[in-house]
Amino acid sequence: MDDDSGGRGLNEDGTIRREGSLSRVPAAFAPVVAAARSRITGAFDGTRLHSAYVYGSIPRGTAVPGVSDLDLLLVLRTRPTGADEAAARAVEAGLDADFGQIDGVGALLTSTDTVTSELERHDLGFFLACLCTPLLGEDLAGRLPRYRPTPLLARETNGDLVLALPRWRRRAAEAATDAERRSLCRGAARRIVRSGFTLVMPQWRGWTSDLAESAEVFARYYPDHPERVEQMRLAARVGRGPSADPAVLTTLIEDLAPWLAAEYLAVHGEKAPRP
């Protein structure tokens, strides 16, 4: 690996370095993380919860008060039930209501068997091992491999982008408020930028979760597609500061995303199907 590996999110051996740390949580968000830990513990006892993680801009140290959201991953000992989902939604709502520093809370639920399965090894397993910061319980990263920026990782992380298109189109058609359009814009834009990055990740030989950097890495490998490059840069901008403009949603969902999904399948193939 070249001397720039550290600047590309890699360890010295070329594996992807885990991003984020509780020590990097900005002071303004420390009470939010502490409350999340306490409320998760209160909502899920030791017979249900195996471990909990925080991910995104807060543990990376780049969160902006009033703009950034709180992202959590809760790993249960068995597959989540309806009661577990309800408990997670209550934790989300309580944290969002009590802390103005955050603009929304999202808690993903899964199980230990799912995270450590062969099927999820290069998707959810990678996500936990490299993009999530331990908050509670045993860190499952110890049961997972070290990951490299390979075509296999690219395929399994975002090789199903095409499946998101019908859902985004339906949400765009049904959106009745600016808040709904902004929520869709942020989610779709982030997924598009991350897919644009992982499309070229094996060539770049590194990892980043920074949206602006991801768009520029994509641009490096698609100089003959200036329109797509500018659309990807737009996606990076609205991924951080979402727009309610229907024209922006149309550009992302009806133009850039279908092209990117087709390009992804051509380069890396289809993600292994899930049951």
What are these regions (language model features)?
Residues P80, D96, G100, F197, ...:
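Hydrophobic/aromatic-lined pockets within catalytic cores
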Residues I40-S51, F99-D103, H225:
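Short secondary-structure junctions
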Residues P31-I40:
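A short, contiguous, amphipathic alpha-helix enriched in charged residues
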Residues V67, D123, G187, R191:
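Short, well-structured alpha-helical interface segments that form or flank functional binding sites
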